[in-house]
């Protein structure tokens, strides 16, 4: 097997966590997260090839492209795209698929699609955000929360209550240079 032959080279089995770390750090999509069925969140439709950031690979000039008109119509209506982000500090809470992404004023502009620990030990992820937030270096706020840990509404908080605070992140290059 590959494991037997590769043992002397340090080959080891990896699971889904390894796959997710590698693809997320490389900026690659996973069906159901960054595109395809189940990728739409917060009342939005499922993400297509354009929203996933791969629209430039669609050959709309090919004469036999049956879905050309549907693809182009969807591209004209597209409001956002998947970007890669990074939390600049270690020790922050992991973001999960569906967690809200906010702008600096606290307005929801998208949602997390994936998040994993990168080779430098920082959390790196991908998120679908509105088009005006895709530039590298754009600051984001992410609510990395589990539904059971939302806490009381801010207006109902009392002394000693704990609330969730969004974690600062920044948009980084979608496909990092090697």
Tell me the role of every PLM-derived stretch:
Residues 1-178:
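Conserved, structured C-terminal
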